[in-house]
Amino acid sequence: MPDAAVTLRPQRPADLPLLVGADTPFDDFGPMAVGAHPAPSRLDDAGALTVVDASGQVAGDVSWHWRAWGPNAGSRCAMIGIWLRPEHRGRGLGRAAQRRVVELFFTHTRVNRVEAHTDVENVAEQRALEGAGFTREGLLRGAQWRDGAYRDGVLYAVLRADLAPRP
């Protein structure tokens, strides 16, 4: 399936009412803090971008923060997350937006790895990540609070070499 047409842009104040108040079974720990990040001045900062569909409607947001796997800057990776409004789910926008943000990181930073994780029961997001080029790497036991209990998550990652053009 080809990627849906999607644009990623800095968040605007007018976006926030559309992005607050998540309607998803995977968020029961309190109000979403979507838009809490200032618009990033650089991809190197933690932040979020608004996901806009082909018709110009705000569909959700994709955000990121940094994780270190070693003591030096070369050992860090970006951890991304996505939230889509219910009426925009199941149309390929999540896959396209996550693929696009990975491309932005690999084009504009020296990062070698981009990660994402999701609830073990969120099969739709697992498919979206796999469609965006991510590889399932493992189970994160008891990593996420949901539905009154700690739940398992699934870790995904994509490496720069995974998306390199093949000869």
Model-derived segments and their meaning:
Residues 1-25, 48, 52-167:
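Acyl-donor (CoA/ACP) binding surface of acyl/acetyltransferases
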